[in-house]
Amino acid sequence: MKKLKASEIRQKYLDFFVEKGHMVEPSAPLVPIDDDTLLWINSGVATLKKYFDGRETPKKPRIVNSQKAIRTNDIENVGFTARHHTFFEMLGNFSIGDYFKQEAIEFAWEFLTSDKWMGMEPDKLYVTIHPEDMEAYNIWHKDIGLEESRIIRIEGNFWDIGEGPSGPNTEIFYDRGEAYGQDDPAEEMYPGGENERYLEVWNLVFSEFNHNKDHSYTPLPNKNIDTGMGLERMASVSQNVRTNYETDLFMPIMNEIEKVSGKQYLVNNEQDVAFKVIADHIRTIAFAISDGALPANEGRGYVLRRLLRRAVRFSQTLGINEPFMYKLVDIVADIMEPYYPNVKEKADFIKRVIKSEEERFHETLEDGLAILNELIKKAKATTNEINGKDAFKLYDTYGFPIELTEEIAVQAGLKVDMTTFESEMQQQRDRARQARQNSQSMQVQSEVLKNITSASTFVGYDTATAQTTLTHLIYNGEEVSQVEAGETVYFMLTETPFYAISGGQVADTGIVYNDNFEIAVSEVTKAPNGQNLHKGVVQFGQVNVGATVSAEVNQNDRRDIQKNHSATHLLHAALKSVLGDHVNQAGSLVEADRLRFDFSHFGPMTNDEIDQVERLVNEEIWKGIDVNIQEMDIASAKEMGAMALFGEKYGDVVRVVNMAPFSIELCGGIHVRNTSEIGLFKIVSESGTGAGVRRIEALTGKAAFLYLEDIQEKFNTMKSQLKVKSDDQVVDKLTQLQDEEKALLKQLEQRDKEITSLKMGNIEDQVEEINGYKVLVTEVDVPNAKAIRSTMDDFKSKLQDTIIILASNVDDKVSMVATVPKSLTNNVKAGDLIKQMAPIVGGKGGGRPDMAQGGGTQPENISKSLSFIKDYIKNL
């Protein structure tokens, strides 16, 4: 058999099937497109469903691909086995109603055994078939010439996922020899058994039956072929290594981990687990981020966060206690190009995301692990189960994925009370949902609304007024025929100019009236059957069903909403231009007085980036671009480059808002006719709303002008107070004052140190020897919390081999700080000292092994805490 690099195997596979008339289907992104049934692309066939189910017809019925995939159903096994992965590549050849078993088997045999391709020894190959699949048996035995003893019948060789296409399959195994085990049926040492000797290298699925609702099977009119070969596994066979992790897909990563950790791979089984976890997870994380996913608290983002934090936890077992996963991204990129250039192209962005996430987790990891270890001790002494409320606190406060807590618990021989954990999670979801609920929204999503099916046409794209008929009135949750003045009512119209809240754009407000009554409209939403449902208060008169009315939108607000919505599109495009294509809309709010835009990005924008975005948007406004709005089919919209919002669902016909060439986006909202109508755009804030999500708030038109006018007024006031004549002198004067303040503060700090030193006397005389350690434990009189740290720095410079613990009372609040020489941190940890002391003074604290700080609210107990910590050190 040829010894080939993984990249060579991939290319040979594609080349072989191209020779056999197959079309190469490029590897699709890991984040599924137009398929809400999948969290990730998890197989080679997942991206081809559109061909198999008939939605699209491929250019050729023969297809070959190498598809990157993610599976996360058994993350806890990754690292502990030879071949479990969360990220992998699946090589596959497919036939959509073209060739079937004969060709599929012959192709597989030729690719594996021909010297031109893999060059495997035929006498080392075995196959499994379904017991009733005589056609496959005859092909293998009579046409290929495989001995009967190397064809194993296994009942499980039938691919079936319930109702739909199904069929038998045949698997091909490679015998790695007696070094991997002696033949012994009792130990499943046979092809198809759980063993390391006979490795499955290819699975050929023959989709020939339809699994019917009554569980009967009928032949399919068009038979299909679906095969899968794991690249990592084939590489391990070709390169003759024991596990996938020793192939050229992983070893460069292992080598880098060895350099960083100082530990060796393949020397210690326990260490090897950590090596494998880190190597597997960094591949998954790098590829997922390159394809548009970001760490978050739910969905696929939660999977990434869980993987990264699991890898960080295992890296600690190798002595790596700082962010380093991001440094592996370049190695992954080098291994996987040129077939996957995306990781290298986005490497800087991927590294920034990973480093940011690592830093966040490291901030809480030590405290979280310390708490978890205490919970484990408590559980072992009582119920052998970690309390669900405690597990939830670890998740909520310290960022520990519950799966990570479970995994550590299992390693300690314990379990987690998941029932209580889920209850706590549900309570949190309920609280969040309650907080999001609009108190003004209609709470009558009842059978009343569901039973109203009469049409209501929105005409507001073209007009802000309409002559229409009031068709339904709902009062106190019931449909009625009339409502009196002063009452709040919900109603529908045959035609309405009022936009219903949707896509981040708020609803229109206005009035609906005739000579007999008037309703002030405050809210418009979508009813269950799609009609616009208006809410308002009857200002005067009696409202009757069937009344002919005038409907008028508040046009001032409408114009401002239009400006803000069109500006939001320009902002989205500008962010992509300045920050990169990874930017996706994560939420928006378009109101009359402001706009808010949430987007995916790994960290705060710089002032320069904000300025660039703002300038780009204003340039498009000043160009006076016509805003063309058209309805078309989704395919035509995508062809013209229209941007679809990530995660949004669209029908067959979509509305395209075109401000070409800068912005083309699918949108159902209301917009200006020309960008010049927006007038002016000003960003007023940029902030974070969660991991990987940033928020911009901005103003347009008159609101932006008034905002700048207010800033100018404040600037003039400041200029007057600084007593300078020109605008240019303001910054110079401020810099001068800041420098003077720093100098004065430095003088004051030095004087405080001198006063403290005089009060303390000779500190060397106060050092005690406790349990073999030099220790200084004392209360200091300082003017503020910052001064206690500077006092500590002063003491450390004089007592370099001494454990120092200081406490102070500042404004009836306790501040404490501890330092331990690095040479002693294996035995004494500053963080532990503070954690022991802080509760005594009614507080908490912690930190690194060499430096920690804390505080409390009970200064009367300072002496008690200092005495306690001396005894604590004495008993270490």
Curated annotation (Swiss-Prot):
Reactions that this protein is recorded to catalyse: tRNA(Ala) + L-alanine + ATP = L-alanyl-tRNA(Ala) + AMP + diphosphate
CDD domains tied to this protein: AlaRS_core
Keyword tags: Aminoacyl-tRNA synthetase, ATP-binding, Cytoplasm, Ligase, Metal-binding, Nucleotide-binding, Protein biosynthesis, RNA-binding, tRNA-binding, Zinc
Annotated cofactor note: Binds 1 zinc ion per subunit.
Recorded GO CC terms: cytosol
Matching PROSITE patterns: AA_TRNA_LIGASE_II_ALA
InterPro entries the record matches: aa-tRNA-synth_II/BPL/LPL (IPR045864), Ala-tRNA-lgiase_IIc (IPR002318), Ala-tRNA-ligase_IIc_anticod-bd (IPR018162), Ala-tRNA-synth_IIc_core (IPR018165), Ala-tRNA-synth_IIc_N (IPR018164), Ala-tRNA_ligase (IPR050058), Ala_tRNA_ligase_euk/bac (IPR023033), DHHA1_dom (IPR003156)
Family: Belongs to the class-II aminoacyl-tRNA synthetase family.
Comment on protein domains: Consists of three domains; the N-terminal catalytic domain, the editing domain and the C-terminal C-Ala domain. The editing domain removes incorrectly charged amino acids, while the C-Ala domain, along with tRNA(Ala), serves as a bridge to cooperatively bring together the editing and aminoacylation centers thus stimulating deacylation of misacylated tRNAs.
The protein's name in its UniProt record: Alanine--tRNA ligase
